[in-house]
Amino acid sequence: MNLLHDIEPGTADEMNVIIEIPKGSKNKYEIDKETGLIALDRVMHTSQDYPFDYGFVPQTLWDDSDALDVLVLTTYPLAPGILVRCRPVAILGMIDGGEKDDKVIAVPTGDPRFDTVKDLSDVNPHTLKEIEHFFGTYKKIQNKEVETTGFQDAKAAKEAFVRGVEMYKEAK
């Protein structure tokens, strides 16, 4: 099974997300587009860990030529390859290496701890600072610049999902 191409993306209200990197990891796993397997891309050589689970929406494409990225706010780390149904609540604008590389912020629909988190305004402000700090600094040790351009609401995140699905279909 190819995790990128064989799994439906879900809907804008409940996306399917494949976890690549567990919360707390320094290992940077990525989906191998040809095999559909999750492969070790590199080990981060910084003191930072991923603040939450990180993955992608299958059958999507984004401006960086990869699937649409998603940071899933979880209480406990999930293993790479796990399928999680998520509600998009925000999106972080990002420019990485001159390319748009936005990150959807989502919550698992199966975790009652996040039942009240429906939009950007429902996310703890410190959590947002933590996310923005991580993505703004995690490549500095490699002398690479990443620019974060701020958060947008759930509506913008859902629009990104729809656009990502459309871009994938157009590229097929």
PLM regions and their residue ranges:
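Hydrophobic N-terminal alpha-helices or hydrophobic patches in metabolic proteins across all domains
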Residues: M1-K172
